[in-house]
Curated annotation (Swiss-Prot):
GO molecular function, one term: phosphatidylglycerol-prolipoprotein diacylglyceryl transferase activity
Transmembrane segments: 19-39, 56-76, 91-111, 231-251
Gene field: lgt
Name recorded for this polypeptide: Phosphatidylglycerol--prolipoprotein diacylglyceryl transferase
Membrane topology: Multi-pass membrane protein
Length: 256
C-alpha cells in the first residue's frame, strides 16, 4: 500500500502573498492552452491570429474560474453557499466544478463569437484539443490538495490518506489525470490533426470527457455533503456528465 505524501498546498510565498499549487495549476493550464493553440495556428495554417487566440484564452479563463466556482457551489455545496456565501471567493481552497466551468466557457465562447464573427462550432473545434492538458493540471492540483480521494480498495496501489482515515483508497485524482488529461488529450489531439467536418472535434470531446468521467467517478468517493444523488449509485459528477454524452452523440450523428 502507498501513503499520501502530504504535499504542502502552498508552492511558495512572496512576502505576505502565498501562491497555492492549485492556483498555479490553473495558470499552467491556461498558458499551456495558449502555447498549444499558437502551435496549431502556425502548423495547420488556421484562420486565426494571435490576438484572437489571446482573447479566446482570456475569455475562457474567466469562464472557467467564474463558472467553475459558481457551479461547484450550486451543484455540490449549495447549503454551504446559502449559509456562508463568502466561501464563493475562496478559490484557493479548491472546490471547482468542471461542468460549471464548461458552462462558463460556453458563455465566454458565445461572447467571443459575437466579437469576431466566428461560428460556435468553429471555436469549439479549435479549443477542444487545448482543454485536456488543463484538466490534467487541475487534477494534479486536486491530488496536491489531498481532496477528491477514492473509495476504499484492496488493490496493491491503494493509497492511505492520513488526513481522511487509515483505509487504503483509490488515488482517483490520478485516475482522472490519466483519463481526462493524458488519454483524452492524445485522442482529441490526434483526431484534430486532420481536417474534420465542423462540429466533429467538439462532439468527440464531449463524448470522450463524459465517458472518462463516468468511469473515473466509479472509483471516487462521493462528496460527503451529497453522497450518491440517484439510484443509490450515481454521483453528481456522473449525473452532470450524462447530458454531455448525449449532446456529444447527437452532434456526432448530426455532423456525420
Amino acid at each position: 500500500m502507498l501513503t499520501y505524501p502530504n504535499i504542502n498546498p502552498i508552492a511558495f510565498s512572496l512576502g505576505p502573498l502565498k501562491v497555492h499549487w492549485y492556483g498555479l495549476m490553473y495558470l499552467i493550464g491556461f498558458v499551456g492552452a495558449w502555447l498549444l493553440g499558437y502551435w496549431r495556428i502556425k502548423h495547420y495554417k488556421l484562420n486565426w491570429n494571435n490576438d484572437q487566440l489571446s482573447d479566446l484564452i482570456f475569455y475562457s479563463a474567466l469562464g472557467v474560474i467564474l463558472g467553475g466556482r459558481v457551479g461547484y457551489m450550486l451543484f455540490y455545496d449549495f447549503q454551504e453557499f446559502i449559509h456562508h456565501p463568502w466561501v464563493l471567493f475562496k478559490i484557493w481552497e479548491g472546490g471547482m466544478s468542471f461542468h460549471g466551468g464548461l458552462l462558463g466557457v460556453v458563455i465566454a465562447a458565445w461572447l467571443f463569437c459575437r466579437k469576431y464573427g466566428k461560428t460556435f462550432l468553429e471555436v469549439g473545434d479549435f479549443v477542444a484539443p487545448l482543454v485536456p492538458l488543463g484538466l490534467a493540471a487541475g487534477r494534479l492540483g486536486n491530488f496536491i490538495n489531498g481532496e477528491l480521494w477514492g473509495r476504499v480498495t484492496d488493490v496493491p496501489w491503494g493509497m492511505i490518506y492520513p488526513h481522511v482515515d487509515d483505509q487504503p483508497r483509490h488515488p482517483s485524482q490520478l485516475y482522472e489525470f490519466g483519463l481526462e488529461g493524458v488519454a483524452l488529450f492524445i485522442l482529441i489531439w490526434c483526431y484534430a490533426s486532420k481536417p474534420r467536418q465542423q462540429g466533429r472535434v467538439s462532439a468527440l470531446f464531449l463524448m470522450g470527457y463524459a465517458i472518462c468521467r463516468l468511469i473515473a467517478e466509479s472509483f471516487r468517493q462521493p462528496d460527503s455533503q451529497l453522497g450518491f444523488v440517484a439510484f443509490g449509485w450515481l454521483t453528481m459528477g456522473q449525473v452532470l456528465s450524462i447530458p454531455m454524452l448525449l449532446i456529444g452523440i447527437w452532434l456526432w450523428w448530426a455532423k456525420r
